[in-house]
Amino acid sequence: GRDSRKGWRTPFNAFASTHRADDYCEGNAWQYTWLAPHDVKGLEGLFGSRAKMIEKLDSLFTVSSVIEGGETSPDISGLIGQYAHGNEPSHHILYLYTMLGQPWKTADKVREVLTTLYHDRPDGLSGNEDVGQMSAWYVLSSLGIYEVEPAGGRYWFGSPLFDRAEVTVPGGVFTITAENNSAANKYIQRVWLNGQPYTKPWIGHVDVMKGGELRFEMGAEEKVWYCPDEPEAYADQRPAEEQRLFKSEAVEGEIARVCGLLTNERLRWMFANCFPNTLDTTVHYGEDEAGNPDTYVYTGDIPAMWLR
């Protein structure tokens, strides 16, 4: 790590901890590397690319769980690799995968923590309750949502543990249902909000407070079911024109027609540049107040392969 004079700590040991007497409070460099929930995009930039950030994030859960040092912090607990669920600085980390476009990894890790690091005995928490946060993580994550950055007003989706839950809110009741839910069917396949197909990997706090129904369809398939928030980041993954699997005038014409109707710039980009790799595909549309397509969601794989 770097010190206050912009120098580098030498020697540096990312596994080391000295309780309340080093650079990290109740943690080490492995845990605090990810503590930028307000600017995940900026953190991604520091890694150099999304792929490199994901690679490092993967390693967090597979490296040794040994905390090195003579007086290590007892708060570094509930370890999976160096992920420390027993202390709050780690609590947002599992949801970074969804923010980085790999929601199945969020689902895997959330289910693992829910089912192995909590139980109904006196020692049922893996760390200090700290004014209720350990329990709050369980409550929110078991509903299938978690507020990664509390000031941002977004609850990111994970993997709901319960088939149905009702939460009393100012606007009435907010109901969350999970169809086909099981230990094996832990991955989100499709989402509906108040009966309409929903294509975001998060829901706003304001929408939760209104009441209504958030419905998940669960399954065993690992998939990206939502539209990426930043489609331009994926543009360089498209194959060159001569490598595309097919080109149909009818398909091109239909895509051009729909793009002319879409008022949302991000969705227009997605529709123009992404196409599912299955013939058995349905596109569901939501409409704006004028009756024009404003949102859509594929029931096939998107964007499992770039065909256009």
Set out the residue ranges of the language-model regions:
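Active-site core of glycosidic bond-cleaving carbohydrate-active enzymes
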Residues: 1-161, 165-175, 206, 212, ...
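Short, low-complexity intrinsically disordered segments
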Residues: 6, 28, 200, 223, ...
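Short, surface-exposed, polar/charged, turn-prone segments marking secondary-structure boundaries
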Residues: 71, 166, 219-221, 282-285
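Beta-rich accessory regions
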Residues: 104, 119, 149-152, 156-241, ...
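N-terminal functional modules and adjacent low-complexity/disordered segments of proteins
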Residues: 120, 140, 240-241, 266
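Low-complexity, Ser/Thr/Pro/Gly-enriched N-terminal "stalk/linker" regions
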Residues: 241-295
